[in-house]
Amino acid sequence: MQEALDALAEYGDDAKLLAGGHSLIPLMKYRLATPKVLIDISGIAELSGVTFEGDSLVIGAATRHAIVEHSPVVKEHCRLLAYTASLVGDPQVRNRGTIGGSVAHGDSASDLPVSLLAMDAQFTAQGRNGTRTIAAADFFVGFWQTALTPNEVLINIKVPLAKQRWSYQKFTIRSQDWATVSSAVYGNAVALGAMADIPIRARDVESALLQGADISQAALLADHNTSPSSDTRASSDYRRHLARVLTEDGLREALARN
């Protein structure tokens, strides 16, 4: 780990971390990322695995999606996370890509950031001067941008052990694709993907539910305070429609769980 931190400090913005490569390599192919130096952190043992810390489940940032998907511990204590991981790409991607890479990429259309936001996850970043914890609500700051500094490594993700009713809904044009829109429900929290530059909480939906609105009424507010784009996958208006539909479906599914 220290060698990785030293390399980041030496090369700064010219360097990129490489673990699974699921997010970085496609960007490099399209020249959207052109690092001069790649720092391979896939072999750092302390960045992989699932452990407990107090009332949290701790997942190392270099843990493969497939490990999160199939881990008996994750399935028992955080089924939303295990299920979301099962929808990331195809089996090849899940066996190579990492949870930390998906999060650090900062793509609002990715699956895991949306569910982690709904769970109020905590992200631990390490630099040469120590570690700091970043709340999910503060971690995603812009289009493909996170709160990580160029000299920091995301080392783990902490999710609460408290069991909540949950759901993850995802609409795609093609199977195993990025989400056109996604919705995660965890307890009283609702998060949306691909409805803004970053994953966002559907605060108006949450407030309506707390005030006694029924699910159908609350879900109509899902697209409030969002800024979906129009692209080859969907128009902004269709994304707004999807947000309302997926949120209602997710709330109903979560309510039906024991």
What are these regions (language model features)?
Residues M1-N258:
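C-terminal structural segment of proteins
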